[in-house]
A protein has these predicted regions:
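Charge-rich, low-complexity N-terminal segments
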Residues: 1-43, 84-88
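Short amphipathic alpha-helical segments
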Residues: 7-15, 64-69, 110, 114-117, ...
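Conserved short hydrophobic interaction patches
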Residues: 18, 22, 72-79, 114-128
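Hydrophobic residues embedded in beta-strands of well-ordered beta-sheets
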Residues: 31-33, 51-53, 92-94
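Short, charged/polar, Gly/Pro-enriched secondary-structure boundary elements
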Residues: 40-44, 102-105
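A short acidic-to-branched-hydrophobic micro-motif
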Residues: 42-61
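Short, internal acidic amphipathic alpha-helical interface segments
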Residues: 56-97
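Well-ordered alpha/beta subsegment
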Residues: 88-120, 124-131
Length: 131
């Protein structure tokens, strides 16, 4: 409904403002915020249609090619409930992407809890694949 779409847009805008007030954002556009966070290039995106908050963490990885690393990424994904691990051989980077429902107002405490879990999972994936 129209009322639900307005509510979802409002939730996304409030979440965006909260993140902007708590983090040093380097760039932004109508759907995403980008910044450096704990050694990762991070993109936070908002979808008002669903409503979703997506966090993508990326980091350069040496020797990204190879069937072994792709198999390891697939194994990580079998055990990763909230997100997915990937290796982009073309640009030589590892990424972890997690999506969370944005169905209630996002508090700073909840955002940083989500972010901490995302970074922990990204670290786990990166160290398994880079090692």
């Amino acid at each position: 409904t129209r009322a639900e779409q307005v509510r979802r847009t409002d939730l996304a805008q409030k979440a965006r403002r909260m993140i902007l007030s708590h983090m040093k954002v380097e760039a932004e556009d109508e759907t995403s915020l980008t910044l450096d966070h704990r050694g990762y290039y991070m993109q936070i995106s908002f979808s008002t249609l669903h409503p979703l908050l997506a966090v993508c963490l990326a980091k350069a990885i040496r020797n990204p090619d190879g069937a072994r690393k792709q198999q390891l990424a697939n194994e990580l994904n079998l055990h990763s409930v909230l997100g997915s691990h990937a290796i982009n051989e073309d640009v030589g980077c590892y990424s972890y992407r997690a999506t969370h429902w944005l169905d209630t107002e996002l508090t700073p405490e909840r955002f940083f809890e989500i972010l901490s879990r995302c970074v922990d999972e990204a670290d786990r994936g990166y160290f398994n694949l880079a090692g």
